[in-house]
Amino acid sequence: MGASTFSQSFAEGYAAWALMLPALVGCALLIYRAFFAIRYPANLPLAGEPDGKRTFSWRTRWRYYIDCEALYKETYDNYTKHGKTVLLPGLGFRHDIVLPQSAMRDIMARPEKELSHADAVLELVQLKYSLGHEKYKADPWPCMLVKSDINSKLEAVCDGMNEELKYAFDKYVGCDTESWKEVDLLETIRMIIMAAASRFTVGFPLCRSEAYLRACWKVNDGIMMNGGLTGATPRLLRPIVGPLVTMKLRQSIEQVKKHVEPIYRQRVQALSQQNSAEKPASDETQDLFQQMLRYAQRERPGELHDLPSMCRRLCFANFAAVHQTTLLVTNMVLNIVSSDPQHNTISVLRDEVKDVIGPDSNAKWTKYKVAQMIKSDSVARETMRLYSNTNRGVFRKVLVEGIKTEDGIELPKGAYVSFLGRPLQCDPETFEDPFEYNPFRFSRIREQAPRDTKGRSSASHLSFVSTSPEHLPFGHGGHSCPGRFLVDFEVKMIVAYLLMNYDVEFPAEYKGQRPANRWMAEALMPPSGARIRIKRRS
């Protein structure tokens, strides 16, 4: 076939496709509206639209992507604050019903068969495509192990993590006491936290394999990308888009599997020689992966001998362990450095570490000591208040008809409901100077609050790990983050080690001001490429 004939055929084919495409899209929309679209009640108002409007304008939909902070604040001021239910535009074709905080008790009291937390998270993360099956959230037994087993052994777990932090700081930050070094903060924190978390999840020596740590981060990044791209796609097209989006992710999971396989084979063989009811040997490793294998031996024997399944469960555990923690610690460091001139933040935190933990970097961290670090705690909670990555919480999917809100809105089956977080955390009626980062905002309140006969502060509900309907970074209720107590240890250990062993400052061109965070739709992300200067203390 000659070039001209090929060009003519291509042009004719392209013209035919151009004529067919609008018809195909139109048919897809008709099918979607007829069989898949959720029919919202007529009395449910739409955020950003006039009363009585039944569909979102393109302008309001676009605001979700370019001005979500203002859209959420407007929704809070006009609806949530007045006890009203409202519909918000979401990612892609998604809509979200936002409920007032007064409805939270009733929502959380509903059983999973009526309002499903698992189904809501599956919609957000799209695990069907990222990990190949929805069971990793629908049956999240590793999370149960964190809540029941690991939290009871926090001090022992954190001994290993603290040791790993020292190694990771030496490796990724350095030990030079003479020269300042400029580092990409987010990238450095990513590697340090993945190393520490891997000491908890897979133990030594795999936690020190940089190739393994980077493969884990590729998996995490792939999970996030899939949640955004596939989640934004109409349901009809997800079986096509999902596998395409996750091609590189599947390769990264295979890389993780290759690293994990030797310890998996070794440990499964050792377990096969024991009775599942036997207590672990005193010298048996106690990392999460070992706990997972022991649990699978007792309760999920089909998964025990399924390496791909166990590897994917480990990948999801890694994702839960490091994603939010990395963003939190990055923001904490930026906030500590930027607030130092006004609040003497670095010296105050160093003094607290000396007083509570002691000057020895090998001192043991205990629950009691961590609870006494109320200034570090305040720095963390204030960071979550202003810079939480997630700005809604308590997500549920409606599975039954007939559930009505207190303001008379019937929640349609298949709809997703949630509660706003950030607008409440920045409400000037609750917080003085709500958009100013005040590192010791919460510690001052706790220090001045009355105490009971056992010395407990009446303001202990303002601790970093405490949740409430007005403070949702960790969720609230029965599905609040089970790993937040481990995160409490981890972030305080990281900040303590950083400040006790390094001097930190911003590059001169920052003029003492932290770079601004950036909004990506409703997610608030640390500034990309933010740098700090760092030098080991003598």
From Swiss-Prot:
Subcellular location: Membrane
Biotechnology and industry use: The fungal sesquiterpenoid aspterric acid (AA) is a submicromolar inhibitor of dihydroxy-acid dehydratase (DHAD) in plants and is effective as an herbicide in spray applications.
Source superkingdom: Eukaryota
Enzyme Commission identifier(s): 1.-.-.-
Keyword terms: Heme, Iron, Membrane, Metal-binding, Monooxygenase, Oxidoreductase, Transmembrane, Transmembrane helix
Membrane-topology annotation of the record: Single-pass membrane protein
Pathway note: Secondary metabolite biosynthesis; terpenoid biosynthesis
A Pfam family hit: p450
GO terms, molecular function: heme binding; iron ion binding; monooxygenase activity; oxidoreductase activity, acting on paired donors, with incorporation or reduction of molecular oxygen
Transmembrane segments: 18-38
One of the record's GO cellular component terms: membrane
Enzyme class: oxidoreductase
Required co-factors: heme
Residue positions binding heme: C481
GO BP, sorted A to Z: secondary metabolic process
PANTHER family hit by this protein: CYTOCHROME P450, P450, PUTATIVE (EUROFUNG)-RELATED
Function: Cytochrome P450 monooxygenase; part of the gene cluster that mediates the biosynthesis of the sesquiterpenoid aspterric acid (AA), an inhibitor of dihydroxy-acid dehydratase (DHAD) effective as an herbicide. AstC catalyzes the third and last step within the pathway and converts the alpha-epoxy carboxylate intermediate produced by the cytochrome P450 monooxygenase astC from (-)daucane into the tricyclic aspterric acid.
Family label: Belongs to the cytochrome P450 family.
UniProt-recorded name of the protein: Cytochrome P450 monooxygenase astC
Organism: Aspergillus terreus (strain NIH 2624 / FGSC A1156)
